[in-house]
């Protein structure tokens, strides 16, 4: 596997830390050891997160190509767009963000707090759009790029989740390399890795990275899209492309994509009672915050699997905490009583 041939612009502090979730493990019976790899604190750029890791492999193209404006898209409380705004500010570039109405959630402050607030503070041109949630290339994003060109700028396109970019999966191939180095220091290997999966490139890159040591099917994606067939197809496509790019040496097949669809309901961006319980439980036992859109659902999935005995006794499970905590502010009504 060859990742070193790709240019990388450092945006993170270095390897994100792996920390034990001792109290949560004990609360769930102590038969499974839970750990978290903290992508939620991987960078000093506006709270960082998984997209910051991905952007390290996209940014060199933007710099080398003389682009002056980063153009991206997400929901109103998109973590992606906040991280793109931060990177644009860091590089001295302009930033245009399309924020679509991906979540059927009504709150008076939803479009004024959290991620979107930070993007505005960092100087991004934020454009609200009424289109609902879906996976793939969006007309509103294409129009934003045309607008930049018409005004004399040179737009660099960054798709939702970085996932449609050919290099979107590379950052999480590197994540797997980091884990292997950290496992040497820890003195053991993780039996399973749990990760939230929506637009696909985080899961796909991780799958390819762990396929290098035979653990592709030990990467358990927790669907939060509520459009699992689209997510599954996207993960497979991105993983197959990424495997070729890094010269993995074997083909990625549909059997390599493990996607648990039990926890995404009722729909994208809306938490269920299990999501909220998982958010509170992890916060109160570990002081680790997760959000209602992504990490709360993957945390719910991991907790539920431990409770159900789905991990063999003695398993060491790594939870990939991808970030997303700023979105909590947009869901304050749900937590008005804690």
Curated annotation (Swiss-Prot):
Q: Which InterPro entries match?
A: ACCD_DCysDesulf, ACP_carboxylate_deaminase, ACP_carboxylate_deaminase_bac, TrpB-like_PALP, TrpB-like_PALP_sf
Q: Which SUPFAM superfamilies match?
A: Tryptophan synthase beta subunit-like PLP-dependent enzymes (SSF53686)
Query: Which catalytic residues are annotated?
Result: 78
This protein's record includes keyword Hydrolase? yes
- GO annotation, biological process: 1-aminocyclopropane-1-carboxylate metabolic process; amine catabolic process
- Write the record's keywords in alphabetical order, separated by commas: Hydrolase, Pyridoxal phosphate
Point out residues bearing the modification N6-(pyridoxal phosphate)lysine: 51
Q: Which cofactor does it need?
A: pyridoxal 5'-phosphate
Identify the Pfam families for this entry.
PALP
At the top level, the lineage of the source is Bacteria
According to its UniProt record, the EC number is 3.5.99.7
Give a short account of what the protein does.
Answer: Catalyzes a cyclopropane ring-opening reaction, the irreversible conversion of 1-aminocyclopropane-1-carboxylate (ACC) to ammonia and alpha-ketobutyrate. Allows growth on ACC as a nitrogen source.
Assembly and binders: Homotrimer.
Q: Which family does it belong to?
A: Belongs to the ACC deaminase/D-cysteine desulfhydrase family.
Identify this protein by name.
1-aminocyclopropane-1-carboxylate deaminase
């Amino acid at each position: 596997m060859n990742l070193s041939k790709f240019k990388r612009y450092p945006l993170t502090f270095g390897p994100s830390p792996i920390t034990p979730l001792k109290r949560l493990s004990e609360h769930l019976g102590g038969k499974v050891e839970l750990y978290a790899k903290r992508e939620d604190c991987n960078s000093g750029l506006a709270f960082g997160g998984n997209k910051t890791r991905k952007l390290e492999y996209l940014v060199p193209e933007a710099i080398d190509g003389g682009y002056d404006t980063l153009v991206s898209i997400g929901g109103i409380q998109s973590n992606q767009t906040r991280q793109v705004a931060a990177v644009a500010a860091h590089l001295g570039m302009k930033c245009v963000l399309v924020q679509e109405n991906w979540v059927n959630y009504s709150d008076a402050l939803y479009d004024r707090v959290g991620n979107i607030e930070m993007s505005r503070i960092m100087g991004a041109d934020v454009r609200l759009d009424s289109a609902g949630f879906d996976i793939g290339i969006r007309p509103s994003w294409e129009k934003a790029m045309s607008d930049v060109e018409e005004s004399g700028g040179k737009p660099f396109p960054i798709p939702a989740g970085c996932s449609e970019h050919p290099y979107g999966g590379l950052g999480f191939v590197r994540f797997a390399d980091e884990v292997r180095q950290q496992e040497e220091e820890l003195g053991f290997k993780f039996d399973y890795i749990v990760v939230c999966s929506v637009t696909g490139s985080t899961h796909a890159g991780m799958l390819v990275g762990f396929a290098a040591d035979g653990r592709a099917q030990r990467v358990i994606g927790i669907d939060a899209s509520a459009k699992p067939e689209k997510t599954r197809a996207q993960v497979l496509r991105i993983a197959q492309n990424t495997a070729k790019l890094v010269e993995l040496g074997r083909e990625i097949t549909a059997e390599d994509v493990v996607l648990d669809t039990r926890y995404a309901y009722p729909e994208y961006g809306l938490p269920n009672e299990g999501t909220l319980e998982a958010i509170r439980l992890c916060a109160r036992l570990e002081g680790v915050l997760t959000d209602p859109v992504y990490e709360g659902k993957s945390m719910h999935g991991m907790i539920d699997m431990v409770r159900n005995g789905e991990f063999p006794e003695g398993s060491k499970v790594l939870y990939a905490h991808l970030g997303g905590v700023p979105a909590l502010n947009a869901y304050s009504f749900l937590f008005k009583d804690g």
